Amino acid sequence: MVQSLLNDITYEDQLTTVEGNMFQMIYGISEEEVEEYAAYVSTGATAEEITVIKAKDEATAKSIKEKLSERVKAQKSSFESYIPKEVEKIDNAIVYQEGVYVILSISNDSEKAETIITGK
């Protein structure tokens, strides 16, 4: 799924991998809460972002979903004064949970991202 989100959606900016301490700093999620994850953020001045997380269990996944929703709110607050044109992307962000999987996608094409994420 991560590769589909990276390859099948056109991004304005290059996305870079987020790992280790940076992952915890950006999302407030410790590596102990997750079994595996892939996270990518914009290298420049866009809000574009992809995060796919496999949580330890469904309760943790629910908590992670809340943290990703908080990330979206923080990004909106930050970009409103910084680069207002990015707010539309943030307003259309997808934060999705299915079982132990939690996904965040911020892009120009939220419809396509949602199709990739949900399979619908």
Q: Across the structure, where does each feature detected by a protein language model lie?
A:
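Soluble, non-membrane globular domain cores that form compact, hydrophobic packing
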Residues: 1-120
